[in-house]
Amino acid sequence: MNKLTTKLVVAIGIGAALYGVLGLWGFSIAPNTFIKPALAILTVFGALFGPVAGLLIGLIGHTVTDTIAGWGIWWGWVISSGIIGLAMGLIQKRVGFSVKHGTYNNRDISYFTIAGLIGIVIAIIFAGSFDIIVMGEPFDKIVIQVLGATIADVIVFLVLGLPITIGLAKSNRKHTHLKIEK
């Protein structure tokens, strides 16, 4: 989707709210680093609505998380969520792929997986670099955070986001292998 339609704006609002609130919940694995199932929201909404929606859901949703949590807005990590959402939405650019219509093939899934993994790595490295250069955070702390966040996001993407997105696409297929018995 390239046009900013009412449907897309509503999807961005719902996605950002879900990502923002669910982002408050997670399992600690390193200093200020959590496994957050909310990343699955970015995966699904990016695949459904495209890179612009994924980007905005990540940016707005992470800002909501940081604001509600009260620890201040960490812009490097906010931008990294936007980058991840954008990467997840790139699958929409593949002709023939549609979660809504249940159309995809193995190449689409491979593309989605690779784009998602590369997006996660780029985003987390960006956030860590931003924290060191702009925020003045100690290098050794950021290395632990970057490694932890990368592992956490990859796990959530592969275990929740990808299977949920594929499951939605499968459930939206227009044809089945069911046969009417006579």
UniProtKB/Swiss-Prot annotation:
A single Gene Ontology CC annotation of this entry is: plasma membrane
Q: Where are the transmembrane segments?
A: 9-29, 40-60, 71-91, 114-134, 142-162
Localization of this protein = Cell membrane
List cystine links: none
Q: Does the keyword Transmembrane helix apply?
A: yes
What HAMAP family does UniProt report for this protein, alphabetically? Answer: UPF0397 (MF_01572)
What are the alphabetically sorted keywords of the record? Answer: Cell membrane, Membrane, Transmembrane, Transmembrane helix
Protein's recorded name: UPF0397 protein BcerKBAB4_2500
**Could you tell me which PANTHER family the record lists for this protein?**
UPF0397 PROTEIN BC_2624-RELATED (PTHR37815), UPF0397 PROTEIN SPR0429 (PTHR37815:SF3)
- Identify the InterPro entries for this entry: ECF_substrate-spec-like, UPF0397
Name the protein family. Belongs to the UPF0397 family.
